[in-house]
């Protein structure tokens, strides 16, 4: 049985989470794995960097004077902190649209202080609080720039959603005819493809010019640099993606997805990592990711010390007392083709 991530209450094993891991180089060669690296996965928000590439490819980011922090924000699953909300509002202002044009829905933001402030002021939740509002503002920027229909931008038949599908097909080397499409939590199309191909996408995001010399590579490079330069826009305070990119200081690009997905690209080795927690529980993702990085020899103890809360995540009770821990217990398998290369 795959009991890769273990949850302890005191010293007693209470729960386990199975995981799947694919580690791929920029050529698409599987280097390491655990579980089923070909498991079909909805990567969810992990695809946001590639959705951002589709925006850049239209010329919209340049036309509307996107700074790096804007590019990073359209890759975000943000916490709804004030600087995130202000960033989305700034983008909407540049394209002369209103918050009501965002079709992402809304929810209580991860940043509870922002929510408490909203309640104290007698306000109500609006789309800008959605963790996907940055992505949607990016999509709308491309749609406005291309003079396309704004109301239908979420539909898979919309030209911009087809551009996104093409980017994913190209970067992940998986035919779009075989990509299953469903609807993400924020209402836009979400794409299902093998974990191995998702990892390939992140290898190419990390080192695009080792893959090919093209406009797509240039756009991947631009998006990756923006995320690493402004990791606070991608997640926020006390978020794994943000903290990982900040601590590794422009070596790693990282993006989580709902239902237990975590993806990472390493600029130095050119490796792409994709992780899926089988039961979809996100509490296992950072612990699994840090163990994968450790086994790959990416980083050192000084960096890991700064990320200790993600290596062995604490289990807290309602009083915020530490009453348990979440740990990793698995060994990556080195693939034969990697041994021979």
Residue ranges and their predicted role:
Residues 16-21, 137, 165, 259-262:
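Short glycine-rich loop/turn motifs
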Residues 43-61:
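Active-site SXXK
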Residues 1-38:
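Beta-lactamase-like hydrolase cores
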Residues 10-13, 129, 251-255:
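Short Gly/Pro-enriched turn/cap motifs at secondary-structure boundaries
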Residues 34-42, 74-78, 122-130, 182-189, ...:
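A short glycine/serine-rich beta->alpha loop
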Residues 1, 67-174, 178:
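Active-site-adjacent helix/loop patches that line small-molecule binding or acyl-intermediate pockets
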Residues 205-341:
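Structured C-terminal helix/loop/strand segments within mature extracytoplasmic catalytic/sensor domains
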Residues 57-64, 96-99, 146-152, 158-165, ...:
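Bacterial peptidoglycan biogenesis and beta-lactam-recognition machinery
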